[in-house]
Amino acid sequence: MSKGHTLVVTKEHFKNFNEVPKNLISKVFSVAQMISQAQIMELHAAGCNILTNINEAAGQTVMHFHVHVIPRYDQTDGFNLDFTPKAIGTFNLPIVAGDLKKGL
């Protein structure tokens, strides 16, 4: 955990990001933005990660919606997303895009 790591948490219970009403999600991310700005200006963070996990498969361990605002100081500050993109293989992108559009 880095100095200034902050959680933005809703008072009302929602299991995860997908359950939060749109008007409240905008307020949560407005607060997260203010915290990020303060981390950079006042704590002299070099950058910031904004993170929320949805369900256990994505790493959610606390089943109450929250947003991590994580100040970053350098590459050795102990936080690592370890995201290594892989080729998408045999997915048919137009079909995947069409499937996603159905849910919007």
Residues of each region from the PLM?
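HIT superfamily nucleotide-processing domains
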Residues: 1-104
